[in-house]
Amino acid sequence: MIYTRITINPNQMSGVPCIRGLRMPVATVIRMVAEGMPTEKILEEHPSLEKEDVQEALRFAAEAVRERELPRTGT
């Protein structure tokens, strides 16, 4: 899959995946979603983001963990 809204630039944020070249790491967006922040609130607090950015960040994160060995859980 090609992610048109995710950029990885070694000269920006140490190469951390970011949204559209902004200094907004994908991980930050994912954390906000995981903490229960509605997309509308994320967009309100970060007006440079668009709804599609949040959606693509979620897809990117899902793909990033899809075929990786995951840490063991307590179950």
PLM regions with names:
Residues M1-M24:
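N-terminal first-folded block
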